[in-house]
Regions:
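Hydrophobic secretory-pathway targeting helix
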Residues: 1-26
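Soluble extramembrane regions of membrane proteins in the secretory/endomembrane system
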Residues: 18-218
Length: 218
């Protein structure tokens, strides 16, 4: 199922486009460019792939600074060429693309979709979730699927957040100390992307500083 929704959702199967919590629920963040969130649950079929590419295009056209894909999938039922095109689209996107495995510890990203972790700008997982079983990494034009020291293990096996971080698989903000509990929510993912420097030198600004009752920024 695909639906365009406002606000933050949980427990929705299929694909759902979510308005950024930053802009939808925090008026103090009004001056920030939006962060879009696309929730993907289930096997990657043609509808899912089209939804992701459409979300990237919408984020680019709408002036969003980032698109977060919240993913829970056991694999893909589309052709290898279709997945290659999707990986290429993510690699070439003019908007930052983040991947977050969630929302629960039972979440998985298995099969060819796990190769998205090698082309996204920021990647993270909720504690207890796993990624892997990538198979042979696909070849892209002008881009490489980078899975760090974990590439061989992920080919036929899987990793937890702790394992993936230690192996250099995850792309996290080096200026933030992320605990072994992982990144527990979409809101946390938005926070972790704040200050992230992209390959082109762009610095993401996803969180607005709020003054407390005494006017001191937090």
């Amino acid at each position: 199922a695909i639906s365009l929704l406002g606000g933050l959702l949980a427990g929705v199967t299929g694909v759902a486009m979510l308005v950024s919590p930053t802009t939808a629920e925090e008026p103090t963040a009004e001056g920030l460019a939006p962060v879009d969130v696309l929730q993907v649950s289930g096997l990657f079929d043609e509808v899912t792939v089209d939804s992701i590419t459409d979300a990237i295009a919408a984020a680019e056209a709408g002036g969003s600074q980032a698109l977060i894909l919240q993913i829970n999938t056991r694999g893909a039922v589309v052709s290898e060429s279709t997945m290659r095109d999707l990986l290429q689209r993510v690699a070439d996107a003019d908007v930052a693309v983040g991947l977050w495995v969630g929302p629960a510890k039972a979440a998985r990203v298995y099969g060819t979709p796990a190769q998205l972790f090698g082309v996204a700008d920021a990647t993270a997982m909720v504690a207890g979730s796993r990624i892997g079983h990538t198979g042979e990494l696909l070849r892209l034009d002008g881009a490489t699927i980078e899975l760090g020291r974990g590439a061989d293990t992920l080919k036929n096996g899987s990793m937890t957040f702790t394992d993936a971080r230690a192996a250099g698989v995850l792309r996290l903000n080096p200026d933030r100390a992320i605990p072994d509990t992982g990144v527990p929510t979409v809101r946390s993912m938005i926070l972790e992307m704040d200050g992230l420097v992209l390959d082109d030198g762009t610095v993401l600004d996803t969180v607005a500083e709020e003054p407390d009752a005494e006017g001191v920024t937090q």
